């Protein structure tokens, strides 16, 4: 009886340990996955505001270029490439969260027309798969398959991103029509300057929150500074500078309100662009080809008829 109780106790302890380990794993994985690929997913139902501005610009304050290339027209139920280019100087290094320097990551959001979506793996050709590499795309929301996001990914390798897109078929999707549609893209390189909660990252300028004399500068053990500013009335304010930005002021210096205390370490930025694509009706294409063929045949018959007429005229003149 006692032996059976011991086995029951051991079984209970093992079950608890497995449950706790599983919970820790799930929580850790969730924290990591929720942090990426794009912070905007956490706070915005739609990444494109009514003004046309993509919300990534709220955190990535510097304006940088981005380019998108898509076919001029596609047929229904066809896989095509949408190529997003995020150019930047590969020699640049950014300030990481720990204050050290490292390579820049890139990320992108692609806003497709309703009905367009990420192509399933079995529909993607080997040529496109080779261009995609090991990239993994995801929908912005489970119910928004036409909005795709990716990142952060190493910019050194993926400053050009190929999205495999499947066009819709109006024959099976009644809300889709043969029209010209807009496509919007946003792309960033490097870390943002502001977090979604409004707090600053260490990849931006820090300004003085008061005017006065810099009475004390304490360099923290793990990096960063604690700057004490004393005004003319003897009141003090303390500004905390995280590791990363370079300090521009020194003790005894008089500074003004909102004067930069640090350099701007940001070397990245965000850009957005757009393109247009036509969902082409196959019957319209066939009709166009038939029309062109008939025009060419008419021209040929006209030339032949003209030569025949010239021969008749020449024969009559000789007669």
Curated annotation (Swiss-Prot):
Record InterPro entries: Cyt-f_TM (IPR024058), Cyt_f (IPR002325), Cyt_f_lg_dom (IPR024094), Cyt_f_lg_dom_sf (IPR036826), Rudment_hybrid_motif (IPR011054)
A Pfam family the protein falls into: Apocytochr_F_C
Gene3D superfamilies with a match to the protein in the record: 2.40.50.100, Cytochrome f large domain, Single helix bin
Transmembrane segments: 285-305
Residues that hold heme according to the record: 36, 56, 59-60
Free-text cofactor note: Binds 1 heme group covalently.
One GO-annotated biological process of the protein: photosynthesis
SUPFAM superfamilies: Cytochrome f subunit of the cytochrome b6f complex, transmembrane anchor, Cytochrome f, large domain, Rudiment single hybrid motif
GO MF, one annotated term: iron ion binding
UniProt keyword list: Chloroplast, Electron transport, Heme, Iron, Membrane, Metal-binding, Photosynthesis, Plastid, Signal, Thylakoid, Transmembrane, Transmembrane helix, Transport
Domain of life where this protein originates: Eukaryota
Keyword Lipid biosynthesis appears in the UniProt entry: no
Compartments reported by the entry: Plastid, Chloroplast thylakoid membrane
Co-factor requirement: heme
PROSITE patterns from the UniProt entry: CYTF
Residues annotated as signal peptide: 1-35
Topology in membrane: Single-pass membrane protein
GO cellular component: chloroplast thylakoid membrane
UniProt similarity note: Belongs to the cytochrome f family.
Role of this protein: Component of the cytochrome b6-f complex, which mediates electron transfer between photosystem II (PSII) and photosystem I (PSI), cyclic electron flow around PSI, and state transitions.
PANTHER family given in the database record: CYTOCHROME F (PTHR33288:SF10), PTHR33288
Assembly and oligomerization: The 4 large subunits of the cytochrome b6-f complex are cytochrome b6, subunit IV (17 kDa polypeptide, petD), cytochrome f and the Rieske protein, while the 4 small subunits are PetG, PetL, PetM and PetN. The complex functions as a dimer.
Official protein name in the record: Cytochrome f
Protein encoded by which gene: petA
